């Protein structure tokens, strides 16, 4: 297990990170200087650093280069925006790293196939973290790394669009939502958005839709 502190849990002067005793199978990067750790059994080189400040505007990774040792060279990189270590991912990949495992954003995002990706949070952090969450799994085959995203979260935040017609009623809207929830399952958490054109005389009660399972938000964008 390779662990580094990011901007939310950065290593303050009095942080427990500084002298915490980790388990033998955990490698923790303790400062803001890029360090390389080799796994002798697997011939894997892991490069990483931890945040000692909440914001770091310097591109600390841009000068990073893999060593010359035979094996797999993996860069752990947290950030990617102007306030949290801006970086040139394509440039780092071209510099010779076999894979760049990225952190900072909560949603999974593949930047370079089998080369660089944000795994995202294992579970959604808030209702704006829509879609699947999980982890990136890698397999080394014949000297080539193959990766794939593995869904893991127990629940996900999903968005349901309910389209109104001129003959729609509150009851028909509720029936539409009930059917949609039945097909998606009741394990997830939903944001409902009402769209479309409605009859002038139609009185909608959007808040009533919150009683249909795990609905946390209802937005009426109809006209």
Indicate where each model-derived feature is located:
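His/Asp/Glu-rich metal-coordinating catalytic cores
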Residues: 1-139
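Accessory, non-catalytic peripheral segments of nucleic-acid enzymes
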Residues: 145-223
């Amino acid at each position: 297990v390779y662990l580094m502190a990011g901007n939310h849990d950065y290593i303050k002067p009095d942080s427990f990170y500084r002298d915490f005793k980790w388990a033998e199978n955990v490698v923790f990067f303790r400062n803001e200087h890029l360090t390389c750790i080799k796994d002798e059994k697997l011939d894997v080189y892991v490069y990483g650093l931890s945040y000692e400040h909440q914001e770091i505007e310097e591109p600390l990774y841009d000068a990073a280069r893999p060593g010359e040792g035979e094996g797999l060279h993996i860069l752990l990189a947290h950030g990617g925006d102007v306030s949290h270590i801006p970086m040139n991912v394509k440039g780092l990949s071209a510099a010779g790293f076999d894979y760049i495992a990225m952190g900072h954003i909560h949603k999974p995002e593949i930047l370079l196939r089998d080369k660089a990706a944000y795994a995202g949070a294992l579970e959604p952090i808030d209702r704006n973290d829509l879609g699947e969450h999980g982890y990136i799994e890698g397999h080394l085959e014949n000297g080539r790394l193959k990766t794939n995203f593995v869904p893991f979260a127990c629940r996900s935040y999903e968005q349901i669009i309910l389209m109104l017609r001129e003959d729609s009623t509150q009851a028909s809207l509720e029936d539409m939502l009930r059917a949609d929830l039945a097909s998606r399952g009741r394990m997830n958490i939903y944001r409902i958005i009402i769209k479309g054109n409605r009859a002038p005389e139609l009185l909608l009660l959007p808040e009533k839709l919150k009683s249909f399972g795990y609905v946390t938000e209802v937005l009426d964008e109809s006209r």
